[in-house]
Structure formats: C-alpha cells, structure tokens
Amino acid sequence: MANRILIDTNVLLDYLLERDPFFEAAKEVILSCINGKAKGCIAAHSIPNMFFILRKDYDAKERREILLNLCKIFDVEGIDKTKLIAGLENENFSDFEDCLQMECAKSYKADYIVTRNVSDYETSEVKAIMPKDYVSL
C-alpha cells in the first residue's frame, strides 16, 4: 500500500522555484504522488502562503494556475476550529505553522511529513522525513 504523506510548504517551493540543491529530491517526492507510489496531501494554509511567496517569480494569473494544478494533483487537508485549538494548545512546538502542518498530517492519517525542517518536528506525532530520505525508502 502506498504511503500517505503530507508535503510541507518548503518542499513544494523547492520544486516550484527549482531551488538548488533541493529541487531534484522535491521533484522525486512529487512524482511519487503523481505516479501513485504515494498518496500526497498539502495543508490548505500552504496555498495562500505560496501564493504570496511566489509573487516575486510569477504574476497572479500564473500563481493561480500553478496552485490550482497542485490542488488537482494532491489531496488538500483543511484547517478547522478543532485543529486550530489543538495547535494553539500544543506548547511542544515553537512554530505554530509547523504544529498546524502536523495537525493536518494527523487528520490525513499521514505516515510522514516530508519536509526539510525535520528538526522543527521533533515532538510531532507524525514522523518527519527529509525529501532525499523519503525517496530512498
């Protein structure tokens, strides 16, 4: 059975912006979802964050098209009141956004959070793994 993964915003941006030296591993993670080797998910709050970050490289129409394509490829796990409260009450995370990523991963029943910021997820209930390590599984 395919792994269920939540792909962190930084990995998606590595792919979309072709950031070296991270692009190739990010591409392999995304291709694993497209090819059915993994079931991929992104957190809904990653979409507006990426829309903002990508503004330096793409105009609004291009950003909408790029992000719409991501939403078609991946499942999208939303943030609701329950996840927000759980994130706000969780003092084990220093970064609130990372905690929300973990809450989305839990809700999605993800096996892994694929991220370059593994150290930010030391207290995560879902194992965090680097893209290069994930593609080596």
Specify the residue positions occupied by each region the protein language model found.
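Acidic, PIN/NYN-like endoribonuclease modules and their adjacent C-terminal/linker elements
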Residues: 2-4, 106-137
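Short, flexible helix/strand-to-coil boundary loops that buttress conserved ligand/catalytic motifs
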Residues: 16, 88-91, 125
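A general alpha-helix detector
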Residues: 11-12, 49-50, 86
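Short, well-structured N-terminal submotif of metal-dependent ribonuclease cores
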Residues: 1-41, 55-62, 123, 136-137
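Short, conserved alpha-helical segments within structured domains
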Residues: 42-46, 83
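Active-site neighborhoods of divalent-metal-dependent phosphate/nucleic-acid chemistry enzymes
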Residues: 75-118
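Short acidic, glycine/proline-enriched helix-loop-strand junctions
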Residues: 63-84, 121-137
